[in-house]
Amino acid sequence: MFARFCKAIPAKGRAFPSVNASIQSRLMATVRNQRVPHERATFTIRDGPIFHGKSFGARTNISGEAVFTTSLVGYPESLTDPSYRGQILVFTQPLIGNYGVPSAERDQHGLLKYFESPHLQAAGVVVADVAEQYSHWTAVESLGEWCAREGVPAISGVDTRAIVTYLREQGSSLARITVGEEYDADQDEAFTDPEQIHLVRQVSTKAPFHVSAADPQCHVAVIDCGVKENILRSLVSRGASITVFPFDYPIHKVAHHFDGVFISNGPGDPTHCQDTTYHLRRLMETSQVPIFGICLGHQLLALAAGARTIKLKYGNRAHNIPALDMSTGRCHITSQNHGYAVDVDTLPSDWKPYFVNLNDSSNEGMIHKSRPIFSTQFHPEAKGGPLDSSYLFDIYIDSVRKYKANQAAFHPQRDSIPSPLLVDLLAKERVGVQPTIGMQNVQAAAAAAAVAAAA
């Protein structure tokens, strides 16, 4: 049907009959042929098969860990998810790119509406077929144009079913994409193992910054291990102003300034983040602040509690994975992207499993038996994926507000006299993120500090 519609498009410069100029302009823009130069490309799995296809991205060679996702939609969100850093992403969906790539538009909070980070994070893209003609009202460029602009190689015309079958049977493997030339498949130096790289250091913020809620009800510290934009949005939209810290920031030293601590998702092996694990352990020893972790944050919290993590054979990357809530018996369809899991048998006695994966029985969450601390391996913020478990953010924010109320009862001046740390952080409002509100916060904090000093 779409092909018949494309054939019906008038020649360049001619008008669509009975269509106003605005709609005509949009139609011409969204169905134009977005062609990028095609060259021979090769996808090589180390000690495995070689696949030949065509390049539709950047003219460069790359290597990394080959993983696959069974998600049907959401490729702009997946490819910008920092958790995919260093990985070559293979899509099982036969056709990718048919709705193009949207703009870097931001929402009322100053957060990206359609992407999970400002740049494409995956090392490479592998698809069976790529749509050169795209059609969607938010699209501004094709998938090939986007990959080329971001410097990411991409290959189409390969048997992704055979690739995924190999990865499922042999496990996630090192691989490479070469464009325009071929290398000896036996040269190990041509393969880079991202697991040997501290990937979190690459994607974490380099300095703290602040994002204000329109009507702030609480203040949450976010440990950024590669946080997704929609996680920040899920917190801010629920009335939490957030201050985002680098992954290795000594959060236990400033936790008393906040009503809650959140640990984000991120890429790579959780055991690389030893500083983060130490700071979280000290945080749980010295503070009763509510804590919530997602994905890598879940794994880091488990390590801090004394548990261990394990590497899965080929990971879980999809938007339709069932997870069972062990406290209610309810099943949630979840969005997941991880290659490691918590070894539930190593959880300390004061913790218990929260969710379990119904496909492979791996751990999907844990919760403390007596304190407001819990975490999930899956992504309740989705983007893309279902929102079955988004209520977990409500549970967390409720615990944060209760903690704030209890602290206010014991320390009435806690919120009226801002600390020098918070005044400084509020001055570092994230660029492009509600600068007016941020400035109001800075001015209010400065005024309150002046009144307190005068008294």
UniProtKB/Swiss-Prot annotation:
GO molecular function: ATP binding; carbamoyl-phosphate synthase (glutamine-hydrolyzing) activity; glutaminase activity
Stretch forming the transit peptide: 1-28
Entry-linked Gene3D superfamilies: 3.40.50.880, Carbamoyl-phosphate synthase small subunit, N-terminal domain (3.50.30.20)
Pfam family, one: CPSase_sm_chain
Cellular component GO terms, alphabetical: carbamoyl-phosphate synthase complex; mitochondrial matrix
Pathway noted in the entry: Amino-acid biosynthesis; L-arginine biosynthesis; carbamoyl phosphate from bicarbonate: step 1/1
Protein name per UniProt: Carbamoyl phosphate synthase arginine-specific small chain
Source organism per UniProt: Aspergillus clavatus (strain ATCC 1007 / CBS 513.65 / DSM 816 / NCTC 3887 / NRRL 1 / QM 1276 / 107)
